[in-house]
């Protein structure tokens, strides 16, 4: 529809969100249906073949490169329909190129991807590749708290999940101050007052014992409110990429 209407900004946004979600999927699952995916109705492809992860990354990187060239200030984005950046074309373009950096960093150990040179090109050419410059550029979706614009995880519950042991141990061992933002201290049991996680994938008997002793759950005041924002990417991630790549 965006192509039919020659709306290049909408095309660029669509390519950006496609790269965001499909990169998350291939990071989780590796090889997956890609070229033949989403063609069940149009082409009757009910069992799409799996594509190599390199093929997927190459395609997504090209999508982001194309998206960067499609943005234009000669046409506007309807702010009422843009829940992420309220119609700000410049911020969308910054998000596209910052996401481009993330994907390049993901494959930085693959020499054939030439990530180092491509990342350097982005940082050295801000006019051609604008990227996040402050927290004001963060790709953060804010919810009003009124349905349907509510956080899907916003149920205020505190007792239906437990934090993973490895995650908790890493934060405790490094005295990471963000731990109180992510989760709560154990309220009762042998582990009361501390930050303790559950062993992922452990037998039911082990998990039952750990649960009885007490485990930390997610902090419902920060992540599980109906108005809790959802962040896709931040300025701090761009700074980490810059520190590691240059």
Predicted feature locations:
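Structured, solvent-exposed acidic/aromatic patches
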Residues: 1-17, 21-246
């Amino acid at each position: 529809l965006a192509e039919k209407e020659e709306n290049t900004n909408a095309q660029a946004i669509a390519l950006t969100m496609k790269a965001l979600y499909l990169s998350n999927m291939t990071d989780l699952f590796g090889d997956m249906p890609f070229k033949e995916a989403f063609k069940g109705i149009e082409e009757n492809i009910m069992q799409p073949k799996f594509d190599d992860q390199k093929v997927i990354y190459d395609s997504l990187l090209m999508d982001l490169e194309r998206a960067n060239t499609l943005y234009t200030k000669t046409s506007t984005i309807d702010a009422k329909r843009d829940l992420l950046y309220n119609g700000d074309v410049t911020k969308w373009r910054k998000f596209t190129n910052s996401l481009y950096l993330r994907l390049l960093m993901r494959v930085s150990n693959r020499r054939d991807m030439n990530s180092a040179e491509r990342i350097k090109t982005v940082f050295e050419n801000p006019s051609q590749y604008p990227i996040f410059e402050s927290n004001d550029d963060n790709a953060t979706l804010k919810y009003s708290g009124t349905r349907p614009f509510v956080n899907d995880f916003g149920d205020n519950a505190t007792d239906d999940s437990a934090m993973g042991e490895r995650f908790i141990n890493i934060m405790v061992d490094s005295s990471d101050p963000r731990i109180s933002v992510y989760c709560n201290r154990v309220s009762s049991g042998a582990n009361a007052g501390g930050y303790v996680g559950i062993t992922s994938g452990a037998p039911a008997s082990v998990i039952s014992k750990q649960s009885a002793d007490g485990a930390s759950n997610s902090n419902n005041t920060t992540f599980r409110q109906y108005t809790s924002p959802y962040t896709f990417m931040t300025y701090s991630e761009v700074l980490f990429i810059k520190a590691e790549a240059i």
